[in-house]
Amino acid sequence: MHWKVAVGVLLALPGPLSAQAAQADSVGARAESAAAVLFKGGEVADAGRVFLGGWAGLVFGEHFMLGGAGITLLEKVELPGSESGTGFDLGMGYGGVILKRWWDLPGRLTGEGGLLLGAGHATVNDRRTGREVGSENFPVLEPEAGLAFRVFRRVYIGASLGYRLVWSIEDLPRVSPDDLRSFSGNLSVRVGGR
């Protein structure tokens, strides 16, 4: 289900938004759109995990993008259990406003930097019963930097490194902010932008 939504956004968004922006602003600078599907690898509670996400936004002057992003953990993390042997599962997702900036490099390469500022939500469930034993909303700040390779005219494959910073985790049993903070390696397919 996640991939269907991501592919739909990737295919549907860039065309209609750039057409609307072109009609609304025929005199000044033209705003276009860009969208991407991304995979993030990093740690959650000392376990290597993969996240699936995407972002979409308006591109101004070919080099600056303002939009929104959403990212979810693909597989829950098993947390240590209590003395009775019951284990717990941690799930999380986050999203928010995303800013991107692209720089022209030689050939088909583009440098990119970005910042996501938003919020996340995590839950801890009893593994045996599935009952939620804790949940928490928390702020997220995630900078990243990387390179993108232009495959076609407006299609790019990118790789970047980032760091997910979270804080104010108080109501999740067996979880601290350090369990949700992590460096990440990111792979993306983007349509639009520079």
Predicted feature descriptions by range:
Residues 28-30, 45-49, 88-94, 134-140, ...:
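Transmembrane beta-barrel outer-membrane domains
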Residues 33-41, 54, 58, 68-72, ...:
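Transmembrane beta-barrel strands of outer-membrane/channel proteins
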Residues 148-194:
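Predominantly the C-terminal beta-signal and adjacent terminal strand-loop region
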Residues 63-141, 149-151, 191:
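Gram-negative (and chloroplast) outer-membrane scaffold detector with strong preference
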Residues 19-66, 184-194:
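Short glycine/proline- and aromatic-enriched beta-strand/turn motifs that initiate or cap beta-hairpins
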Residues 4-16:
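Bacterial N-terminal signal peptides
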Residues 27-33, 62-64, 107-113, 153-157, ...:
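Outer-envelope beta-barrel architecture signal
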Residues 36-40, 81-83, 127-130, 170-172:
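Extracytoplasmic loops and strand-loop junctions of Gram-negative outer membrane beta-barrel proteins
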